[in-house]
Amino acid sequence: MTNLRKTHPLMKIINNSFIDLPAPSNISAWWNFGSLLGICLVIQILTGLFLAMHYTSDTLTAFSSVAHICRDVKFGWLIRNLHANGASFFFMCIYIHIGRGFYYGSYLNKETWNIGVVLLLTLMATAFVGYVLPWGQMSFWGATVITNLLSAIPYIGTTLAEWIWGGFAVDKATLTRFFAFHFILPFIITALVIVHLLFLHETGSNNPSGVNPDSDKIPFHPYYTIKDALGLLFLLLTLLMLALFSPDSLGDPDNFSPANPLNTPPHIKPEWYFLFAYAILRSIPNKLGGVLALLASILILLIIPLLHTANQRSMMFRPVSQTLFWILAANLITLTWIGGQPVEQPFIIIGQLASILYFMLILVLMPMAGLFENYMLKPKW
């Protein structure tokens, strides 16, 4: 008798995706972050669902409804802390996941990569509208500053901003629609994840060497299920440690004050995971130029497959590209630091230099390094 998991229409899909899936035998722990992102998504949807049961999307009661969740709802404090810090872990995992794809040349699976970039943009939109919901000072002013960037678009900008606000400023209508967006977007993300996996399983996983692994494959279960379970254990442990012992360390103290349109906080800044893009936005004195640079800093990921010049797929055996990759990583950390600093010297010039270096590394230096490495590998006799 044939096994049910191989014949049943639904079980067959699960079997071919998570059990009998042929996987390269040499994929490292850097490949764990895909499954961790899936776990993060499940955690966020579940905790978010329970928060939505008690939250009210009205400017008069939003802030106090969040306080009510933390004080009066059974384990409400834990659900909220897991949701708020879960977002940080989601971004930590996605940035490492993108970095791994960049380092090992996974972007040459173009469909999977492009869907991944769309996923990143959707996740950023979800996190942004979610940050507005508690209706604290930083929520309100963050929403005001970021949505105001739309007014930089020539001719239609102001109309577009007012259309998104549902009025002449960020107010009740904005909060209500942001809650609606924040509720629906995770389900759109889930659909995109399925498409992402569909395209991934068309080509199969890449591996650290970048060489075609078809000659040496092993079944996903039990080898990678147990490996993913270990990663999951680490993720849950660190998330619980953060949510239980230091839940507010990644947040902004200003968000403990209710939103006040008449009082601007001294330093308006987004959550830490947007600071690198915020630093790039601020490094250009012109409003429209800043918005374009902000968009370019994310959308540049779409053209990375076109900038691949090396004969080898992975950076594993390409020391020059490796060096540039880690300079890029350090540069992004620098931008994240600058994004959280006030707009004054020397932070302005550091931010401008780091922004120029970010685009230079991706658009010029890394493609040149690939060509140089090709030349170095050519026999010279």
Curated annotation (Swiss-Prot):
An MF annotation (GO) of this entry: ubiquinol-cytochrome-c reductase activity
Pfam families, per the entry: Cytochrom_B_C, Cytochrome_B
A biological-process GO annotation: mitochondrial electron transport, ubiquinol to cytochrome c
Keywords annotated in UniProt: Electron transport, Heme, Iron, Membrane, Metal-binding, Mitochondrion, Mitochondrion inner membrane, Respiratory chain, Transmembrane, Transmembrane helix, Transport, Ubiquinone
Binding residues annotated for heme b b566, in chain numbering: H97, H196
Gene Ontology CC annotation, any one: mitochondrial inner membrane
Primary location group: mitochondrion
Annotated signal sequence range: none
Record: residues binding heme b b562: H83, H182
Parts of the chain that traverse the membrane: 33-53, 77-98, 113-133, 178-198, 226-246, 288-308, 320-340, 347-367
Family: Belongs to the cytochrome b family.
Official protein name in the record: Cytochrome b
Organism the protein comes from: Planigale ingrami
Organism ancestry: Eukaryota, Metazoa, Chordata, Craniata, Vertebrata
Gene: MT-CYB
